[in-house]
């Protein structure tokens, strides 16, 4: 099976570097499936999971809070603002953050409060989507 080099990095660390058969991510125009030999592409990443399919048939899932995806025919690079291995996401903490954001939105005192609450809600929704992907993978 054909492979391509994949690097998933954040400001803080490199989360993955190696050969993959496919990468699936949400770009500015929607979900993208990147295979070896894909046409060159640069796009902004949306909040949510990135799925990296490995040669051995397993899958790595990483949550990203945005960033840039660069695709060359045999190399794909994810430069994420924040990236967390899906296995390291804390569902209880995310649910608590969502609850706090909902309370902030309900008690907003300014447009700034509203914007911060909506951003936090979007981030927690994307993190919970990433956790769901892991749970579906386990079944």
UniProtKB/Swiss-Prot annotation:
MF terms (GO), sorted A to Z: ATP binding; proton-transporting ATP synthase activity, rotational mechanism
Main location: membrane
Subcellular location: Cell inner membrane
Topological category with respect to the lipid bilayer: Peripheral membrane protein
Cell membrane recorded as keyword: yes
GO cellular component annotations of the record: plasma membrane; proton-transporting ATP synthase complex
Record-annotated membrane-spanning stretches: none
InterPro entries, sorted: ATP_F1_dsu/esu_C_sf (IPR036794), ATP_synth_F1_dsu/esu (IPR001469), ATP_synth_F1_dsu/esu_N (IPR020546), ATPsynth_dsu/esu_N (IPR036771)
UniProt keywords, alphabetically: ATP synthesis, Cell inner membrane, Cell membrane, CF(1), Hydrogen ion transport, Ion transport, Membrane, Transport
Pfam families: ATP-synt_DE_N
Protein family (similarity comment): Belongs to the ATPase epsilon chain family.
HAMAP family: ATP_synth_epsil_bac
Described function: Produces ATP from ADP in the presence of a proton gradient across the membrane.
PANTHER family tied to this protein: ATP SYNTHASE DELTA/EPSILON CHAIN, ATP SYNTHASE EPSILON CHAIN, CHLOROPLASTIC
Assembly notes: F-type ATPases have 2 components, CF(1) - the catalytic core - and CF(0) - the membrane proton channel. CF(1) has five subunits: alpha(3), beta(3), gamma(1), delta(1), epsilon(1). CF(0) has three main subunits: a, b and c.
NCBIfam families named among the record's database cross-references: ATP_synt_epsi, PRK00571.1-4
Protein name per its UniProtKB record: ATP synthase epsilon chain
Organism: Acinetobacter baumannii (strain SDF)
Lineage of the species this protein comes from: Bacteria, Pseudomonadati, Pseudomonadota, Gammaproteobacteria, Moraxellales
């Amino acid at each position: 099976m054909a492979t391509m080099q994949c690097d998933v990095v954040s400001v803080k660390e490199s989360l993955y570097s190696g050969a993959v058969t496919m990468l699936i991510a949400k770009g500015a125009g929607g979900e993208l499936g990147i295979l070896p030999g894909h046409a060159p592409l640069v796009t902004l990443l949306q909040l949510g999971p990135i799925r990296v399919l490995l040669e051995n048939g397993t899958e790595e899932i990483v949550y990203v809070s945005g960033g840039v995806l660069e695709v060359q025919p045999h190399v794909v690079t994810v430069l994420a603002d924040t990236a967390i291995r899906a296995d390291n996401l804390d569902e209880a903490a995310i649910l608590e953050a969502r609850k706090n954001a909902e309370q902030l939105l309900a008690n907003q005192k300014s447009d700034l409060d509203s914007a911060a609450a909506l951003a936090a809600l979007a981030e927690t929704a994307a993190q919970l989507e990433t956790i769901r992907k892991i749970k579906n993978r386990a079944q």
